[in-house]
């Protein structure tokens, strides 16, 4: 209602003659975004009891709230995007105003950080659920947009394209991340970007 992001969830089994909708999450208790399924386990991104986001699974054969499982728990960093790959769950976080991608193995839920050490913003993640390859865009204060391909199976990353700006070389500039303490002691992340010869 209005700008309220909370939602209910219904599903329909098209394999049966009775095609009536079945309530899975009947209460307005949070935001639930359906990600996909692994058999009878339905996976959701949710902010239910997790303001910064988490991933849960609900078995449609045993959907009571007490049986919900947390697959990826809430962290101190905001979970901003989730994609299902063939063998991994891709989680994009905002950590100190920079993007970070973690991959969780669907079977063991062991996690690994992708081998991409640039600080900045990742966007436009594109993939399919039958592949462990995904694509993304990257930019920061001194780097024009770049597009990468990442293979989660062998951790190989390839630069596919980068925007060329006439008379501009990113290597001529420096961008540093610093942390400034506020009055209450909280460390505030900030960037200082400048030309090398200044």
Language model features with spans:
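Feature representing long, continuous alpha-helical segments
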Residues: 53, 66, 87, 99, ...
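Short, solvent-exposed loop/turn segments at conserved positions within beta-propeller repeat blades
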Residues: 2-6, 47-53, 94-99, 140-143
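Conserved loop/turn motif of beta-propeller repeat scaffolds
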Residues: 39, 86-88, 131
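Hydrophobic beta-strand positions that form the internal "hydrophobic ladder"
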Residues: 42-44, 89-91, 134
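Generic long, charged, amphipathic alpha-helical segments
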Residues: 66-91
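A cross-family structural signal marking well-folded subdomains
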Residues: 88-93, 100-102
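Non-catalytic accessory segments flanking enzyme active sites
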Residues: 1-37, 70, 81, 104, ...
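Extended hydrophobic/aromatic segments used for targeting, binding, or gating
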Residues: 18-74
């Amino acid at each position: 209602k209005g700008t309220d992001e909370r939602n209910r969830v219904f599903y329909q089994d098209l394999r049966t003659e009775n095609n009536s909708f079945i309530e899975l999450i009947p209460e307005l208790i949070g935001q639930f975004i359906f990600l996909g399924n692994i058999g009878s386990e339905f996976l959701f991104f949710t902010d239910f009891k997790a303001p910064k986001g988490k991933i849960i699974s609900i078995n449609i054969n045993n959907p009571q709230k007490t049986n919900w499982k947390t697959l990826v728990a809430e962290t101190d960093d905001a979970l901003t995007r989730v994609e299902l790959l063939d063998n991994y769950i891709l989680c994009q976080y905002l950590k100190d105003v920079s993007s970070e991608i973690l991959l969780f193995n669907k079977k063991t839920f062991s996690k690994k950080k992708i081998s991409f050490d640039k600080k900045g913003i990742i966007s436009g993640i594109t993939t399919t659920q039958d592949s462990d390859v995904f694509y993304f865009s990257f930019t920061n204060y001194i780097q024009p947009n770049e597009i990468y391909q990442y293979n989660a199976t062998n951790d190989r990353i390839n630069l596919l394209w980068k925007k060329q700006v006439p008379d501009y070389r990113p290597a001529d500039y420096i961008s540093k991340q610093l942390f400034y303490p506020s009055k209450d002691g909280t460390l505030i992340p900030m960037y200082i970007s400048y030309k090398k010869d200044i």
